[in-house]
Amino acid sequence: MKQEILFIILNEYADWEGAFIAACLNAGVMPGSEVKYTPKVVAPTLDAVRSIGGFRTLPDYCFQTMPTDYAALVLIGGMQWNSPEAEQAVPLVKDALQRGKIVGAICNAASFMAKHGFLNNVKHTGNTIQQL
């Protein structure tokens, strides 16, 4: 059975940031390799989420219904990681880290992670030092 990789998106998410990761997960990390993971989208609610590019995405799960058994959490960057909506993700990230899950964050989501102290003791990259 394939393990789920949960992609957290917020309104005005950067639709290009998760595309390459999701494609590799769906096709196998290397061409011809076994497909072990499946990407799933998580958002604050089950309502459609609009990307920066105008795509409307229907989440597979909302924050309240997402499974607890998953392989990794990926926070996709975007324009709303400083919003009250983003604050709802703090307990999800905290729980994932406490349970030893892999957590990735791209672009402004990395700044969100830094703001909440999640990056204090790990090597990481981000947009600019001023944002971290």
Regions found by a protein language model. Give the residues of each.
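Short, hydrophobic beta-strand segments that form beta-sheet elements in well-ordered domains
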Residues: 40-43, 103-107, 123-127
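Extended, subdomain-level signal for the structured scaffold at the beginning of enzyme domains
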Residues: 1-99, 112-121, 132
